């Protein structure tokens, strides 16, 4: 009887390497697939693609599996990077890793794996898949400190039915331990951080290559001008560092935070104090929705939600919202407690305990700024 073939997405990191080894040990016919999703700067100081491929080949040789590389750079630019630039141009703060998982790692990659006669795919993500009553559920990882279900919330039933997450049941410390025990050449390689196509380079420098700077006024909620920004795209809601107002002589002495963007007037609004009303929200509206089960929760459903990665689940109630301009579905979340710096463009992801239900892209978060005359909510960036 032939072995079941599993194609493993291998990045050169320790997680995907241990994933491949575990599946090989379990008797699967394992094939490694290295995805190249970015073409520019292959020889630049911030690009690790070449070394990552060397690490993948070394690991494959050690554990005895075949490996190949596939170039998804064109698909990535069309499906992920173009949207990334559109969102930043509109003043929002997108999360490209969420879209990359849905469009590249679990779509383009999955399709390619099936062309290699694979039955399943596997990655080194920290999450779990469970089949129950004929449906597939996306669950948080056993190690909640490494859980990545937030980034995977847009996966659908077809994708989950073909996906394995072998690391979902173990802590990261165990993964490192296995890597050392079997002598993986990348056992001590540090975890990747930041957006995949930016790597370790300064984010503002990277963004400046693709989006023009457009300086404008920086004002307080009462309309007082306190400085000048370099372009709304280069700031995000709740940002503290890099504003350039550290010791403003007219301030209260508390740190400054980005609180809103007014696109028509090209104005950046800033406030002082971590708990300023403009930074706190009890409700949000999200669009571009995606549900793991294929349908939304019931109206009024009590659940938990994350509005950023590694945030603790915040108690809230789900509600249906008026459809968007093109008739697209939207939803609201009403939080029990005020949430800090809920950022348009980021994902609001819903949970029922350990089960990830899905979510959507935050369009607007109601806060103290909505009642302020200096920056009417209708003109703020989150209004689409």
Curated annotation (Swiss-Prot):
<keyword id="KW-0694">RNA-binding</keyword>
<feature type="binding site">
    <location>
        <position position="35"/>
    </location>
    <ligand>
        <name>ATP</name>
    </ligand>
</feature>
<keyword id="KW-0808">Transferase</keyword>
<dbReference type="GO" id="GO:0000049">
    <property type="term" value="F:tRNA binding"/>
</dbReference>
<feature type="region of interest" description="Interaction with tRNA">
    <location>
        <begin position="146"/>
        <end position="148"/>
    </location>
</feature>
<keyword id="KW-0820">tRNA-binding</keyword>
<keyword id="KW-0819">tRNA processing</keyword>
<dbReference type="Pfam" id="PF03054">
    <property type="entry name" value="tRNA_Me_trans"/>
</dbReference>
<dbReference type="Pfam" id="PF20258">
    <property type="entry name" value="tRNA_Me_trans_C"/>
</dbReference>
<dbReference type="InterPro" id="IPR004506">
    <property type="entry name" value="MnmA-like"/>
</dbReference>
<dbReference type="GO" id="GO:0002143">
    <property type="term" value="P:tRNA wobble position uridine thiolation"/>
</dbReference>
<keyword id="KW-0963">Cytoplasm</keyword>
<feature type="active site" description="Cysteine persulfide intermediate">
    <location>
        <position position="196"/>
    </location>
</feature>
<keyword id="KW-1015">Disulfide bond</keyword>
<feature type="binding site">
    <location>
        <position position="124"/>
    </location>
    <ligand>
        <name>ATP</name>
    </ligand>
</feature>
<feature type="disulfide bond" description="Alternate">
    <location>
        <begin position="100"/>
        <end position="196"/>
    </location>
</feature>
<feature type="region of interest" description="Interaction with target base in tRNA">
    <location>
        <begin position="95"/>
        <end position="97"/>
    </location>
</feature>
<keyword id="KW-0547">Nucleotide-binding</keyword>
<comment type="similarity">
    <text>Belongs to the MnmA/TRMU family.</text>
</comment>
<feature type="site" description="Interaction with tRNA">
    <location>
        <position position="125"/>
    </location>
</feature>
<dbReference type="InterPro" id="IPR023382">
    <property type="entry name" value="MnmA-like_central_sf"/>
</dbReference>
<dbReference type="GO" id="GO:0005524">
    <property type="term" value="F:ATP binding"/>
</dbReference>
<dbReference type="InterPro" id="IPR046885">
    <property type="entry name" value="MnmA-like_C"/>
</dbReference>
<feature type="binding site">
    <location>
        <begin position="9"/>
        <end position="16"/>
    </location>
    <ligand>
        <name>ATP</name>
    </ligand>
</feature>
<protein>
    <recommendedName>
        <fullName>tRNA-specific 2-thiouridylase MnmA</fullName>
        <ecNumber>2.8.1.13</ecNumber>
    </recommendedName>
</protein>
<dbReference type="Pfam" id="PF20259">
    <property type="entry name" value="tRNA_Me_trans_M"/>
</dbReference>
<keyword id="KW-0067">ATP-binding</keyword>
<dbReference type="InterPro" id="IPR046884">
    <property type="entry name" value="MnmA-like_central"/>
</dbReference>
<feature type="active site" description="Nucleophile">
    <location>
        <position position="100"/>
    </location>
</feature>
<feature type="site" description="Interaction with tRNA">
    <location>
        <position position="346"/>
    </location>
</feature>
<comment type="function">
    <text>Catalyzes the 2-thiolation of uridine at the wobble position (U34) of tRNA, leading to the formation of s(2)U34.</text>
</comment>
<dbReference type="GO" id="GO:0103016">
    <property type="term" value="F:tRNA-uridine 2-sulfurtransferase activity"/>
</dbReference>
<feature type="region of interest" description="Interaction with tRNA">
    <location>
        <begin position="308"/>
        <end position="309"/>
    </location>
</feature>
<dbReference type="GO" id="GO:0005737">
    <property type="term" value="C:cytoplasm"/>
</dbReference>
<dbReference type="InterPro" id="IPR014729">
    <property type="entry name" value="Rossmann-like_a/b/a_fold"/>
</dbReference>
